[in-house]
From Swiss-Prot:
Protein name, per record: Tyrosine-protein phosphatase CDC14 homolog
Pfam families named among the record's database cross-references: DSPc, DSPn
UniProt superkingdom: Eukaryota
Gene that this polypeptide is encoded by: clp1
One Gene Ontology term of the molecular function aspect: protein tyrosine phosphatase activity
Length: 537
């Protein structure tokens, strides 16, 4: 349904054909709009300003607003009439902001809307809604918005520190008055209140026999509601023994009026708060219970419940109007990250303590190197285990073998086959003559491969054919009368062919024993098959 052209100005829709908001320069005439029910709170729910502040409206106003809306809905339901409910306000920017804020907060706390949906209808309003200022006398340089109020209440509800069903409107409106103590609940943990004044009291004089009525009301209420700690932030205006005599602890944490506390004082306040038992209540006051009180309570709510600075300022002002004044707003905004960091710092410290408690420190052994298998034998006398095969070792004077020369499983099998084939060849061909091979030069020691146990070795020998074929006889045996180098070859003792040159002698000296390939029984050596004349490991 479009009401834009009905002379009602801009109609902001929250629920189609059910709930709307608009601002009008004059009250509408009901007979012109029979399908709508108009109501306003401008003259019914009134904000009581300190100076130039005008809102937001407090939590008792919110509850009363919900009662009004539900009363209208119930009336139409009983009459079986379907009318759109329209909240309207004056075009005054302050009244307009209060009405729109109250409706959005109602949608979140009562109708359980998520904050972004409650704010969406107000986002395109023209002109935009005015921000809320502090209660100070100076020129305002810091504002909170309807969005801050909505998210502040939402976060308080999500953190279980606000349940409007548990708020007694009568008590709220009674005790917020100066003559009745001037205090408000901020959360189930905190009460903010103005300093009690004990007329005629000072440090040197005796305690007055009778307390002023506001002080007596505060004292009785605190005892009945499990207040365990009083934190005084201003200079003394009463005797602290008044609280101590009824079992309430009293703590002085003074700093100047209108200023902000040191971060060390904030940490002390947080630590002090967490020392109070879970169901114990802490009452905090300065002179008026607004500025300095709001600093410390706001810092704790940011620390504990993840409020942003704007959210916590807005929330506290809804619970107790006027809280946090002037530069204290900027202080909360600047230091909000430090409050959260302190939370994680303490959480980490607790986690470390729990881990340490779970694994208590043990006395170290008298001999740290003793075996840990339950015996008293020292590791010094315990034999070392066998070295793992294949561990790298350095040998002086030799270069380490290249990676391609390391034995693999296939090369080990090949070497074993070669060994068996050589033995079989010696037995079957022991009558063949070895006449024309050169001195069977054996490669350097680094080409020797060791497999199996350390006592069993297999020597892999490279055999080369002669580059000259002129000395090969028809039967395939090379003539023993000459060497491939051209030097005369002679038969030496020990069944070795050697040349007369010094090179041949040195080669013979370098060669390893070929007992695995020789059979000296007949003075002959086995001749390998030509296809296996070059073996590469």
């Amino acid at each position: 349904m479009d009401y834009q052209d009905d002379g009602l100005g801009e109609m902001i829709e929250f629920l189609e054909d059910k709930l709307y908001y608009t601002s009008l320069s004059q009250p509408p005439k009901a007979e012109l709009y029979p399908h709508m029910h108009f109501f306003t709170i401008d003259d019914e729910l009134i904000y009581n300003p300190f100076y130039h502040d005008f809102g937001p409206l407090n939590v008792s106003h919110l509850i009363r607003f919900a009662v009004i809306v539900h009363g209208i809905m119930g009336k139409h339901r009983q009459a079986k009439k379907s009318k759109a409910i329209v909240l309207y306000s004056s075009t005054d920017t302050r009244l307009r902001a209060n009405a729109a804020c109250l409706l959005a907060c109602y949608m979140v706390l009562v109708q359980n809307w998520p904050p972004h949906l409650a704010l969406a209808p107000l986002a395109q309003a023209e002109p935009p809604f005015l921000g809320f200022r502090d209660a100070g006398y100076a020129v305002s340089d810091y504002y909170i918005t309807i969005q801050d109020c909505v998210y502040g209440l939402w976060r308080a509800r999500e953190s279980s520190i606000l349940n409007i069903r548990n708020i007694d409107v009568h008590d709220y409106e009674t005790y917020e008055r100066v003559e009745n103590g001037d205090f408000n609940w901020i959360s189930p943990k905190f009460i903010a209140f103005a300093s009690p004044i004990q007329a005629g009291w000072n440090h040197a004089s005796t305690r007055p026999k009778k307390l002023p009525q506001p002080f007596a009301i505060v004292l009785d209420y605190f005892v009945a509601n499990k207040v365990k700690l009083i934190v005084r932030l201003n200079g003394p205006l009463y005797d602290k023994k008044t609280f101590e005599n009824v079992g309430i602890r009293h703590k002085e944490m003074y700093f100047e009026d209108g200023t902000v506390p040191e971060l060390s004082l904030v940490k002390e306040f947080i630590d002090l708060t967490e020392e109070v038992e879970e169901d114990g209540v802490i009452a905090v006051h300065c002179k008026a219970g607004l500025g300095r009180t709001g600093c410390l309570i706001g810092a704790y709510l940011i620390y504990k419940h993840c409020f942003t600075a704007n959210e916590v300022i807005a929330y506290m002002r809804i619970m107790r109007p006027g809280m946090v004044v002037g530069p204290q707003q900027h202080w909360l905004h600047i230091n909000q990250v430090h409050f959260r960091a302190y939370f994680y710092e303490k959480a980490m410290g607790r986690a470390i303590q729990q881990a340490t408690a779970a694994e208590p420190l043990a006395t170290p052994p008298r001999h740290p190197l003793n075996a840990t298998n339950g015996t008293s034998q020292s590791n010094i006398s315990t034999p070392l285990p066998e070295p793992t095969p294949g561990q790298p070792r350095k040998v002086s004077g030799h270069n380490p073998p290249s990676a391609r020369r390391l034995p693999s499983a296939s090369s080990v099998k090949f070497n074993e086959k070669l060994k068996n084939a050589s033995k079989q060849s010696i037995q079957n061909e022991n009558k063949a003559s070895y006449s024309s091979y050169e001195d069977s030069e054996i490669q350097n020691d680094d080409e020797t491969r060791t497999v199996g146990t350390p006592t069993e070795t297999i020597s892999v020998v490279r055999l080369r054919r002669s580059s000259s074929q002129s000395n090969i006889e028809p039967n395939g045996v090379r003539s023993p009368t000459s060497s491939p180098t051209g030097s005369p070859i002679r038969r030496t003792s020990g069944n070795r062919w050697s040349s007369g040159s010094s090179h041949s002698k040195k080669s013979a000296q370098r060669s390893v024993s070929m007992s695995s390939l020789n059979n000296t029984s007949n003075g002959r050596v086995a001749k390998p098959k030509p296809s296996k004349s070059r073996l590469i490991s």
